[in-house]
């Protein structure tokens, strides 16, 4: 894979448990670990954004940085234009967490 390709990485999801009675109290998803080599370009900014149900964001284009996305609640479909001009629809959800990498100079929404 090249640095200009749109990539997806299936993420692990692990239940977390209460320390007293061991009931499941949530989940944890490791998004990035340096030994996994899932992020090809070193992040220079990290932020969280949200989208209300039924709403959309974009399309937009970042000219100087890669973008990485993962859905932590609900479900989202990312739409990105690849090097061939084709549109990709990539789904990520709390049940099926996928890290989406959009390289610079690729339109996405």
Identify what each model region corresponds to:
Residues 95-109:
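Well-ordered alpha/beta subsegment
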